[in-house]
């Protein structure tokens, strides 16, 4: 049974100055991190800040797995932030995310509540937890034209080499899904090599970091099941609606994964079966890249406390309780 006295004490301690100013819950897709964050927020009277690079877009609901029902626990609405904050078709970035995060984080702290950062976008998470100093990167048309002449495989290798020079991974996992996104990631990386110091000037935020570790085969099973559920729930119709709103196919393809493959199906590039097969493979690869990123975060000095995803929710909450 959860210790209600502990949670009352902790809620008071938040306003009095505990050592952690935030809890971070991260994990790969289909690990159950959002539901864990919501239940924890329920017990702590906390608020959730999303760290998902695609859930920021309005109207991209099924494909990004917003699962807003997770934010209701025992009939109580859990406040969440940085979801549905910009229009589909636009191109949000990690620099904007840092600014939006700080605004929301400060507002939550002003109310003496605890922010819970939750998501699986490694770049966004690390930009907050490591406090990267970022600036806007202007388009470099000459560089883009040069890169467009190269194969996608060569571009990915170039991006890897840039990351090695920067000694970090300043790109999103989905930046490898399309040539356009990889080119933009290279453009940002080259700018950072000459213009920016990726270290810091972002406020240090002490955070307890929890990782949800799901068995590989269970993760694969859940990904496959969830993909078919989303198709049944109208994911193709969602993408058609976005296209009917005037969003260009290439702009949806830019977002990668579901929006890339479903759009290619709608415009006739892929059959339905090809779309499902290729999308399923891509999501499995994406989840693997997420875990690779999180392990890289640990190598770069970020301590992640891993919790087994198969544990009952009550046990997960109690384990987090012992770490606070």
Show the residue positions of the predicted features:
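Phosphate/pyrophosphate-binding catalytic cores of soluble transferases and nucleic-acid-acting enzymes
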Residues: 2-324
């Amino acid at each position: 049974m959860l210790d209600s006295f502990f949670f009352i004490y902790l809620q008071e301690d938040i306003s009095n100055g505990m050592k952690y100013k935030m809890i971070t819950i991260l994990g790969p897709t289909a690990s159950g991190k959002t539901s864990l964050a919501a239940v924890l927020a329920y017990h702590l009277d906390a608020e959730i800040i999303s760290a998902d690079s695609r859930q920021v877009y309005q109207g991209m609901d099924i494909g990004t797995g917003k699962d807003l029902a997770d934010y209701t626990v025992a009939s109580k609405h859990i406040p969440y932030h940085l979801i549905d904050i910009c229009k589909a078709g636009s191109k949000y970035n990690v620099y904007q995310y840092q600014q939006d995060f700080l605004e929301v984080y400060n507002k939550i702290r002003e109310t003496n509540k605890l922010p819970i950062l939750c998501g699986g976008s490694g770049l966004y998470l690390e930009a907050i937890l490591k406090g990267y100093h970022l600036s806007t990167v202007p388009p470099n048309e000459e560089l883009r034209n040069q890169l467009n002449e190269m194969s996608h495989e060569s571009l990915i290798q170039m991006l890897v080499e840039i990351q090695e020079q920067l000694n970090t991974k300043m790109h999103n996992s989905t930046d490898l899904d399309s040539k356009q996104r990889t080119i933009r990631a290279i453009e940002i990386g080259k700018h950072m090599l000459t213009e920016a110091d990726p270290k810091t000037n972002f406020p240090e935020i002490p955070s307890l970091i929890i990782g949800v570790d799901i068995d590989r085969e269970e993760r694969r099973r859940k990904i496959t099941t969830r993909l078919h559920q989303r198709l049944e729930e109208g994911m193709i119709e969602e993408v058609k609606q976005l296209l009917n709103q005037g969003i260009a196919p290439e702009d949806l393809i830019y977002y990668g994964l579901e929006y890339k493959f479903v759009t290619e199906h709608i415009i006739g590039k892929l059959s339905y079966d090809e779309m499902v097969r290729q999308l399923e493979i891509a999501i499995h690869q994406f989840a693997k890249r997420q875990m690779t990123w999180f392990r890289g975060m640990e190598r770069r000095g970020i301590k992640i406390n891993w919790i087994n995803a198969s544990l009952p929710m009550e046990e997960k909450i109690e384990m987090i309780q012992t770490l606070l």
